[in-house]
Regions:
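Basic/polar N-terminal segments that are highly enriched at the extreme N-terminus
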Residues: 1-8, 158-166
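Beta-strand/loop substructures that line and gate deep hydrophobic ligand-binding cavities in soluble
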Residues: 81, 86-150
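Hydrophobic ligand-binding cavity/cleft-lining segments
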Residues: 1-45
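Hydrophobic pocket/interface hotspot
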Residues: 24, 34, 58, 79, ...
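Intrinsic-disorder/low-complexity, polar/charged segments enriched in Ser/Thr/Lys/Arg/Asp/Glu/Gln
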Residues: 8-14, 21, 57, 74, ...
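Short beta-edge strand/loop motif at the mouth of beta-sheet-based domains
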Residues: 12, 32-74, 166
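Short, charged/polar surface micro-motifs in flexible loops or helix N-caps
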Residues: 30-34, 55-57, 65-67, 81-88, ...
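A generic structural micro-feature
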Residues: 5-7, 52, 69-73, 111-115, ...
């Protein structure tokens, strides 16, 4: 089940996965897993550097195809809260490949897109399955953020299914 709701300043997606909490946690916190599902359809993640601890940094590169060819975007952030198998909170800002923050306007984002957003992931064991609630705070309601996350979580569900059926 997917419930995507947009408000003025947050996108929230709730999903239940047929997998244990520790596997979903690994998908969020281990670079090789994260890179396999993150981003909308067609996106690849050539770089996922993740120091998953409070105060640790993350540097993610997303490559997408556009009508004008391939485009590579970089995101930098910091982990604010890490509670194993329960809660993950990190910031996210557009950056260059060295992790220097860039203006959203310089990256072609619409007016009002914040320089720094916050991603909150809550995981709950529901009889061996995992209920996940992800809130991306700071994403404007009229952005494509909700659709992008929904596509990413479809990819996550496929990866989890493949992982649990091996």
């Amino acid at each position: 089940m997917t419930d995507t709701s947009d408000s003025q300043d947050a996108v929230t997606v709730e999903r239940t996965f047929d997998a244990p909490v520790d596997l979903i946690w690994q998908m969020w916190t281990e670079p090789q897993h994260f890179a396999a599902w993150y981003g909308p359809d067609g996106a690849t993640i050539p770089v996922a550097k993740m120091d998953v601890r409070v105060g640790g940094t993350r540097l993610i590169s997303m490559r997408v195809q556009t009508p004008n060819g391939a485009m590579q975007m970089w995101f930098v952030g910091e982990y604010r809260e890490v509670v194993d198998n329960k809660r993950l909170v990190y910031t996210e800002s557009m950056s260059d490949e060295k992790g220097n923050m860039l203006s959203p306007a310089d990256m072609g984002m619409p007016p009002g897109h914040p320089a720094t957003t916050e991603v909150r992931v809550e995981l709950e064991d529901v009889g061996g399955r995992t209920k996940m609630v992800m809130t991306h705070v700071g994403i404007p309601a009229d952005s494509s953020g909700g659709a992008g996350w929904a596509m990413a979580f479809d990819k996550l569900a496929a990866r989890v299914s493949a992982h649990t059926n091996t």
